[in-house]
Amino acid sequence: VYLPHFKRCIEEGAASVMGAYNKVYGEQASESKYLLKDILRDKWGFEGFTLSDFLWAVKDGPKAVKSGMNVEMPCICHYAEQIPKAIEDGTLAMEDVDEAVGYILRTVLYYETRKDPQEYTEDILACPEHIAVAKRAAEESMVLLKNENHVLPLDKEKTEKIVVLGVLGDTENIGDHGSSKVHPYYTVTPFKGLMKKMPKAQILYNDGSDLEHAKELAADADAVVIVAGYIHSDEGEYLADRSDIAGMGGDRASMRLHQRDIDLIHGVKGVNPNTVVSIIGSSAILIDEWEKDVPAIIFSFYSGMEGGNVLADILFGDVCPSGKLPYTVALSEDSYPDFDPDCTYAEYEYYHGYCKMDKENIPVLYPFGYGLSYTTFDISEPTVEVFDKTAKISVNVKNTGDVKGAEVVQLYIGCEGSAVDRPVK
């Protein structure tokens, strides 16, 4: 469940791998021989170098080196303090250090000889191939959660006036500004994406701060798109003990939308039957308090440089949504583990996420793997071929609707009557 997507990155030639902060099987991930050597090196054949996540991923420097962690980031805190003494007293072999240095030098020399320019111009960043990848990523990830009375897709011939509401409706919003920050050559906002999609229509933008005015605009439009959610200062990298940046980034203070977004949705509810809410965020957002007030909801996540264009394509049916929820949208905060945005240590038990909710029969609003489409599919009964250590499970998928689309085939496995405590699926 957790390793295949990392394995695919290695198979595609990833040159470095970062260890995480969390523990796996009781060990720090950045000090785990099982992860860093047994799986990454021996099983997958990785030949690049490994580095730790920043500041707190490594606790025991010598153990990390022996386990296959080559570089401590962002400074050599534990390595500088602990490694010389460990070599001196014989608890760390010089061969382990040499091995780590070897992986680093080999990777650096390989890329140095390729003369990578390091600075990338528009013809590289915004080349047709990169734009196509950005569009595909957004197209396949957006999730259509609700489409009451088939509000979507909107009719191009009948849509002459669209109102985009919300602070994020015309904000270039691609997510975290920490180590995962990217610098695309351009970013298309929802408002600009709709303007490009419908050049002959009247497209209006309003941040929604004046609820009465927003309501008037919504009532007079053929369709309303409310863009709600988060930006990097709401959820991103954050140091819990840094008072000078308290309140910026890190874990969200709430699992719900900002009150301004909730007020906007409540404020315009009922005035336009063609209202769509596009939600931007990285993980589960509770929507139960307003979900019934709007006919259509799309989880857009942080959809990258082409996000606004893709949202417009989905709204007007040029792209058929096929994304599925990578988490469960619960009915309340009580369905999740205790939540403390300022904690420096948290322990999650074996069951969390959708596995916990399944195990405890907790009702949810939208389950893990949920996502609507503009078409319908028929999936045949599976056929199973059992081999020595593997099994091949096959199904036939048929598009039974009138719209070209794609379906994500999901396979869940359970162990009924198992003597070992296991997830339901």
Task: Report each predicted region and the residues it spans.
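Proline-centered turn/helix-capping motifs that create local helix->coil transitions or kinks
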Residues: 10, 108-116, 324, 362
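A short alpha-helix capping/helix-coil boundary motif
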Residues: 15-18, 40-41, 61-63, 117-118, ...
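Second-shell residues forming the walls of enzyme active-site clefts
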Residues: 1-96, 103
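C-terminal non-catalytic regions of proteins with extracellular/luminal or membrane-system context
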Residues: 3-4, 26-29, 45, 51-54, ...
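Conserved, charged catalytic cores of large soluble enzymes
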Residues: 81, 95-102, 106-124
